[in-house]
Amino acid sequence: EQKNLEHDLAVPFSWRWLNGPWKLMFFEPGVYSPRQDKSEAWNRGAYIATALAHCTECHSPRGLGGATDTGRFMAGNPVGPDGGYVPNITPHPDAWMRDWEKADIAVYLETGELPDSDYAGGAMAEVSDNGLAFLTQSDLVALVEFIAALKPLPSTRDR
C-alpha cells in the first residue's frame, strides 16, 4: 500500500489563482463525443485511454504551460512523471511497441508482462497492477483496439 503524498508544487505553480488563466488558454471543457467513423469498441477504448486511464498524461509530450501536445498524441514523452522517457505507443516504425500484436498489447496492459517475458517497471507497473488489471475483458479489448489504431507518429525524444 502506498501512502498519498502531500501536494508539493513549487511557487508559482502552487498558486491556485493561476488555474483560471491556464484553463482559459489550455482547457477544453465538454463531454466525450463518439466518432461516427469508428467502431463502438474503438470509441470505448478512446474514452478509457483519454478520460479514465489518462494514458495521454504520460505518453504524450507537453508544450507551453504544461498542456499536452495534441499534435504528438501518444508519441512518447521525454520528461515523464518520474523524470525519465515514457515510450511512444503509436504503431510508428521507431516506436517501442511497433512489432506487437493486439494480443501482446492486451497481455501487457492486463499483467505488465512484455512479449520478451520481462515486466513493466516504474509508474507503468503501478498502472497495470492497480488499474488496468481490473478492466473487464470487453474494456481491455476496446482499449487495445484504440491503441492499435493510433496514428503512427515518430517518437518524441527531445526535451
Question: Language-model segments: which ranges?
Answer:
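Electron-transfer interface patches adjacent to heme c in soluble/periplasmic c-type cytochromes
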Residues: 72-115, 128-140
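Electrostatic cytochrome c docking/interface patches
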Residues: 20-50
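Stable alpha-helical elements in mature extracytoplasmic
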Residues: 41-44, 54, 101, 105, ...
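Protein kinase-like catalytic domain
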Residues: 49, 59, 110-113, 151
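A cross-kingdom marker for long, charged
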Residues: 122-159
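Inter-heme linker and motif-flanking segments adjacent to c-type heme-binding CXXCH motifs
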Residues: 1-5, 38-40, 64-68, 113-115, ...
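The canonical Cys-X-X-Cys-His
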Residues: 45, 52-62, 143, 147
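Extended, well-folded interaction surfaces typified by the phenylalanyl-tRNA synthetase beta subunit core
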Residues: 2-22
